[in-house]
Amino acid sequence: MKNCISRRSFLKAAGILGAAGALAACGGSSSTSTAASSTASSAAASAAGTGASIKLWTYPIGGWGNDDTVQNLISSFNAKYPDIKVTVEYLDYTNGDDQVNTAIEGGSAPDLVMEGPERLVANWGAKGVMAPLNDLWTDDAKKDIYASVESACHNEKGDYYEYPLCMTAHCMAVNMTKVKEVGADKYIDTDKHTWSTEGFLNTVDALYKGGYENVAAIYCSGQGGDQGTRAIINNMYGGTFTDAAHTKYTADSAENIKAIQALYDAKGVNFDPSINGGEEITLFRNGTLQMAFCWNIAQQLNSDNNDAGLTNSGDEIFPMAFPTESGDPKLCGGIWGFGIFDNGDEAKIEAAKTFIDFIAADPDQVGASVLASTYFPVRESVGDIYAGNDIMSEYTKFMSYLGDYYQITPGWATARTEWWNMLQRVGTGEPVEQAVATFVQNANAAATAEA
C-alpha cells in the first residue's frame, strides 16, 4: 500500500484538529433578499406583479459562494425589478449534491441552481427534473457565447438546461520556491507554464530526494476536485477519459494505465483515501505538499492566509498545465451558469428566467456578474474585464489549453464515484489493469442505461 497522509495528520497540519466536526458539516447557509421580475416575457411580468418568490442554491463558484457578493448582485437585480423575493442557500462540494438530490426526492428542489453542465445537463437534466431554457438561447446569445460552451449546455436532443455565465481552465500548481531550491525549475517552461511528463517526474524525484516526503497526493476520499486526478492521468501519456462522441469511458487505455502506474511507482506521490481536492489545497498551502492537482484561478487569487500567489509561509505558488509527452496539454474546463428545476409553477420558472436573463445576459450587468466569480466570461462581447490585473492576464494563457468538455457523457454521476473508488483500490495495491477494468465496466454500464 502506498503511504498516505492520515486524517489526523491532515487535521493537525490544517490547524483545525479541535474543529474536526466542521469537515463533516452537511448544511449550507442561507440568506434572503428582495429582487424583482423581468418584463422579458408576459409570464415574467405576471410573476413580478404577483410578487413571485424563488429559491437560488449556489455552489461555491468563486465569489458566488460569498453572501456579501451575492447580495450585492441581487441588489442590482432588485434595482431594476423590485418584486421577487430571492432566498439564497450556499452549498459546498462535500454535501451539496446530497442536499440537492434529497430536495428533489422530497419535492422541495430550489427554483434556481448555479453549477456546471455535468450536473445541470448530464445529471439532473437527464433525469427530467430541469426546465428547458431554449427560449433564453436566442440567435444572438448563440453567436455571442463560445461554441464550445454552448455545445456543453444542451443534450443530444437540443434542449438547453444551462445558461452559462463564466468559465475557467483547471490546472495544477507547484511550490516554485521549493522547486528552485532543489534545482528542478530547469524542467519548467515558465513562459508557457508547461512541462514534459519526464520533467514532471524528475521534479517529483528531485523534491523527494531534497527531503520533501509528501510531494503530491492522488486524493481520493470522494469526488471533490476529481478533475485534477483525471487530468494528471489523462495528460501524462495522451490518454482520454471518454471517447470523442461522449458515449463511453476509456480509462482502461494503455496510456491511462501507464500514467496511473507511473504515479503509483513515484516516490513522493501518495494515493491518499483520507483527503479530497479541497483538503489537498489546504495541505499544499501549509507546506505539507509541494504540488497541487486541484487548482484554478480562484485558488491563485486566494488571499485568506497570505497574499495572492503565496503559500501560508510566503513561498511562491506557480500555476502549471498538466505534464504531457506531446507538449499539448488538455485541461479540464469549468463552465458555470444557471439551471431551473421544474417544480410545476410556471410563474416561478419565468421569474427564475428573469433572474438569469439579467445576471447572465444583460449587457450592463453581465461583466459584474462574471467578475464576482473571479473566472472568465463565456461571451465574446464582455471583452477584457481584467485589464491591468497581472495575475489574471497571465492566467489567460491557460485558456488556450482547454480540452474536450466530456463531463456531459451519460453515466457521469456513476463514473465520478467509480473513479475515486478505483483510485482507492490502486492505492491499496490492486493491479492497475484490474482496477481500471472495473471502473470502465461499471461506468459504461451506467452510460448505457442513461443513453
Language model: regions and residue ranges:
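Extracytoplasmic/periplasmic substrate-recognition and gating elements
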Residues: 52, 75, 79-80, 85, ...
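Glycine-centered hinge/linker elements that transmit conformational signals in sensory
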Residues: 201-208, 245-275
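Extracytoplasmic/periplasmic solute-binding protein
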Residues: 157-165, 170, 196-248, 289
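Short helix-initiation/N-cap motifs at beta->coil->alpha
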Residues: 90-99, 118, 194-199, 273-286
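Short, solvent-exposed loop/beta-turn-alpha elements that line the ligand-binding surface or hinge
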Residues: 134-145, 189-193, 216-219, 239-258, ...
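Hinge/lid segment of periplasmic solute-binding proteins
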Residues: 43-48, 116-171, 198-201, 314-323, ...
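Conserved C-terminal helix/tail region of periplasmic/extracytoplasmic solute-binding proteins
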Residues: 364-366, 373-383, 397-451
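Conserved N-terminal structural module of periplasmic/extracytoplasmic solute-binding proteins
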Residues: 2-6, 11-122, 127, 138-142, ...
